[in-house]
């Protein structure tokens, strides 16, 4: 898994990621990933609250890469979130953009800058005994940006928030 992750990050970094953009509904992708990860979510001890609109939020994205972004971010919450707390995942239209916000309470105070968190192999102190390559956020950021989107991380004490934005598809 580490080798595969490294391969993905380096491809994204040097612009050799092959994208298959098509019109995808971001809401449907989030629902699909939520379903695929339902066992992990259930076992995490964290209450996940999904606030998803009934309307489609279509963007021109690579469905597989975008699912990977959502997977990495949701799995991170199950791994590093504090048990007994809630995680909020919201998709919404914001002007000409589709915005997906994920926020949760970290099991440990995050004494690390948002920039450092997306560097390769950087993991918060608390994650030393958690499985993972340390590339989850780096891959999520790379796959977001290579598709013309932005991924912003905000850290405030133990509150962790990720905001993803992509241009909405006209129509």
PLM region spans:
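Short conserved segment of the HATPase_c
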Residues: 109-122
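Conserved micro-motifs of the catalytic ATP-binding
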Residues: 14-19, 58-61
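Short helix-loop "hinge" at the ATP-lid/N-box region of the Bergerat-fold HATPase_c
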Residues: 77-78
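Conserved glycine-rich
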Residues: 148-149
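Short alpha-helical Gxxx[C/S/T] motif in the catalytic ATP-binding
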Residues: 136, 140
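Short beta-strand/loop element within the Bergerat-fold HATPase_c
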Residues: 84-96
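Conserved catalytic submotifs in the C-terminal HATPase_c
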Residues: 20-23, 42, 47-57
């Amino acid at each position: 898994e580490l080798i595969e992750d490294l391969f993905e990050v380096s491809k994204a970094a040097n612009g050799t990621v092959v994208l298959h953009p098509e019109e995808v509904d971001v809401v449907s992708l989030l629902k699909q990933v939520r379903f695929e990860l339902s066992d992990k979510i259930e076992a995490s001890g964290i209450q996940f609250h999904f606030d998803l609109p009934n309307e489609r939020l279509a963007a021109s994205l690579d469905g597989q890469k975008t699912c990977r972004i959502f997977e990495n971010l949701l799995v991170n919450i199950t791994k590093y979130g504090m048990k007994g707390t809630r995680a909020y995942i919201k998709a919404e239209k914001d002007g000409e953009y589709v915005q997906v916000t994920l926020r949760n309470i970290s099991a440990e105070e995050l004494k690390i800058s948002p920039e450092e968190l997306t560097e390769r192999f950087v993991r918060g102190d608390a994650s030393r005994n958690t499985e993972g390559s340390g590339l989850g956020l780096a891959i999520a950021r790379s796959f977001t940006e290579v598709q013309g989107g932005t991924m912003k991380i905000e850290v405030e004490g133990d509150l962790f928030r990720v905001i993803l934005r992509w241009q909405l598809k006209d129509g």
